[in-house]
Amino acid sequence: MKEMSRYLWPKDSWGDKLRVLLAVGLLVGGKVLNVQVPFFFREIVDSLNVDIAATGGTVATVAGTMIFAYGASRIGAVVSQELRNAVFSSVAQKAIRRVATRTFGHLLNLDLNFHLSKQTGGLTRAIDRGTKGISFLLTSMVFHIVPTALEISMVCGILTYQFGWEFAAVTALTMSAYTAFTIWTTAWRTKFRRQANAADNKASTVAVDSLINYEAVKYFNNEKYEIGRYDKALHQYEKSSIKVATSLAFLNSGQNIIFSSALTIMMWLGAKGIVAGSLSVGDLVLINQLVFQLSVPLNFLGSVYRELRQSLLDMETLFNLQKVNLSIKEKPNAASLVLPKGGEIRFDNVSFGYYPDRPILNNLSVTIPAGKKVAVVGPSGCGKSTLLRLLFRSYDPQSGRIFIDDQDIRDVSLDSLRRSIGVVPQDTPLFNDTVELNIRYGNLDASREKVLEAARRAHIHDKIESWPHGYQTKVGERGLMISGGEKQRLAVSRLILKDPPLLFFDEATSALDTHTEQALMSNINEVLKEKRRTSVFVAHRLRTIYDADVIIVLKEGRVVEMGSHRELMEGNGLYTELWMAQEMSMHDQSLGRSEREAPVPVK
């Protein structure tokens, strides 16, 4: 509630504050008019509870004014309520937008480790339910809880003043019993709702995971397995939902028994008053109307309290996401990264591991010279891609420091650091949108001509133009509607459009055929020579990086060799072993193809 008050009463928006005050004014006015309705009804009954034929007169003269006042009060109460809804709706929707935007922005700023450990389906579900919970909380507070409390207070005061302590005592006992029963039962039901929420998140996560990996499901004929996983999650949700529904029936029954008992007692007391001559028939009608008038807000209060507890649970999850600490933080007033040397990168005794018991880099020290093409090679798991994640500050090293042109990357702003680095990852992330938007994502302000030029330089323009919808072709979720090679060339196009001073290629051509790879690498090399960009190529296929100015060989998180291709081959070390193993593999594959293609001799 404290968190929500900042959004409901924003410091910087006098317009929203005025709307809240106007909504409160309409609320009070509407409830005052609503409470007047039973009084006018009593006057109408008492006015007509005489022998009109004997006394003379008409409906207009006997009860006309009261009937008009009765109708006007009902209309006024309804109009006030609807105006209140209309006035407050903009406040509620703005608050929801602010919370959702802030949470979404916070999630985008969290470190990579958080997103790798969380499942997307569960996060989106939590945000969706949380924003709905906020909407319900705001509307229930303004439209149900506060109006109900005001109406109950007014009715209790009227019953006490008009009819004495007995009616007041019954009313007070009813309110206490109703409220206590509702709170106790709802608290008991909360654990069932929590279980249902957890099962709902699990089912959503399983569904999203299976649909995203649709091809893998098909490749291994595991449809039944995935359906079984989903059904198992839904079965848990089913069991929890049955408990929720059963406990709700118990709650509703108890509330109705309490209220009906109170109404019966009050009607008995009213009837006794009529027999004793202290009350009129109109008074009995007034008591009945006032008590029934309480039934609607009380029923609302019961249902609102139930939903309010659920909404608070959902909001708790949402606000807890906002409270997740940023492990990667920039210093206050951090300076922007500048590159006076052109982008020299230096790792100084860097140690890092994704898990404490599994170190990846061990006191690694290496310098990547500015304006040079540098390759990083080595066996799988030696830490090649980890260098990029540390440089990009997706993670911070456990020890050691990383410098760019003698500036510790922890001392510069994250925005300037990440704007200076361009990446072509091995698994290209694409949005479910057009080809043009996915290329333009490298520079959202780029003109169409620059987008086309970037595509040409990445050797993908002609291919795109051959598609029926050209640059407006949708690539599908995660780019599933285009080939792996096309995805990689789109990623290169995006990088060329961004045009950063530091370039990282993580197996950027692994999905390309030899001819396309050679043409693309030729264009990339032209870009590097034109602007003397510092570039780092992570590669397994050594033939793609043999022309690098410097080749860094990693093993078990340390630099074991460093030099040009010729120098490393002369050194006869790990690089030579890797090169010879790949050459032998290519020779065997070529020999195998030749044997398969050789003509069978005719006997």
Curated annotation (Swiss-Prot):
Positions bound to glutathione: R189, T190, K191, F192, R193, N252, S253, G254, Q255, G302
Any one biological process term the GO annotation gives: intracellular iron ion homeostasis
Family: Belongs to the ABC transporter superfamily. ABCB family. Heavy Metal importer (TC 3.A.1.210) subfamily.
Principal subcellular localisation of the protein: mitochondrion
Record topological domains on the Mitochondrial intermembrane side: 42-64, 162, 269-283
Transmembrane segments: 20-41, 65-88, 138-161, 163-183, 250-268, 284-305
Residue ranges occupied by any ABC transporter domain in the UniProt entry: 345-581
Protein name: Iron-sulfur clusters transporter ATM1, mitochondrial
Mitochondrial matrix face residues: 89-137, 184-249, 306-603
Annotated ranges, domain ABC transmembrane type-1: 20-310
UniProt organism field: Chaetomium globosum (strain ATCC 6205 / CBS 148.51 / DSM 1962 / NBRC 6347 / NRRL 1970)
The protein's assembly and partners: Homodimer.
Xref: Gene3D superfamilies: ABC transporter type 1, transmembrane domain, P-loop containing nucleotide triphosphate hydrolases
GO CC field: mitochondrial inner membrane
One protein family per Pfam: ABC_membrane
Secretion signal span: none
Taxonomic lineage: Eukaryota, Fungi, Dikarya, Ascomycota, Pezizomycotina
Chain's role: Performs an essential function in the generation of cytoplasmic iron-sulfur proteins by mediating the ATP-dependent export of Fe/S cluster precursors synthesized by NFS1 and other mitochondrial proteins. Hydrolyzes ATP. Binds glutathione and may function by transporting a glutathione-conjugated iron-sulfur compound.
